[in-house]
């Protein structure tokens, strides 16, 4: 007895060949648009257009107009593997993912936390860094020794981030209400923290560790981190899997040849072991 599924597949394949022949002869028009070939387009023009928010040190920052950070060095190395150049776009964080969906650029290289909801909408690369949510306080504040000590206090964070969402969930379980202030970017939150207008800032542990290392007289990280273990990745569109596969292959190669560790040590002060596949998110 013939396998119905195999037979249907064979028939579909034959039909595609017939339609392809008719289309090449100009006898029929395509009923549906061709699948996206962003990787092919990138290689044809010799340029990858990548977007981020250059207000997220140590991953992305603008130093007197010069783009620097973990993502800059990583994407340059990836582009070299792909044989193309990179064009960088600096956008507000709240415009980055909508811009990707609107096809205004090829890839998001801003660190995006892998979450269950985002996995439904975007294609993620393998992780590039830890994204676990943590808190930072003023260095001289003795009233906060652990995350639970923010009960009854004011904490700031960047609007639209998973770290802010995790803060709200964490705060809801504390005995006293926490006032949560939302900011356009983390630098504004840090400025208000230093000025005493808020009591703590939320961000990923690597971001906070970097900020505290830059200003040890002003800031201190509150340990342990309170969030679920999570990771940052780059993001593409769901129909651009060939691009994501190529980027992943490059990232895995850079991890294997020591390039990833070198970049991590430069910006984080240490190398970090990361998964070489996209992990199942816990949030």
Model-derived segments and spans:
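Extended ligand-binding regions for polar small-molecule ligands
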Residues: 73-81, 141, 148, 153-154, ...
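Periplasmic-binding protein-like
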Residues: 54, 129-137, 209-248, 270-283
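Acidic, polar ligand-binding/catalytic clefts
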Residues: 80, 85-149
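Extracytoplasmic small-molecule ligand-binding "clamshell" domains
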Residues: 37-111
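Ligand-binding clefts/hinges and TM-proximal coupling segments of bilobed small-molecule sensing domains
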Residues: 162-180, 220-221, 252-283
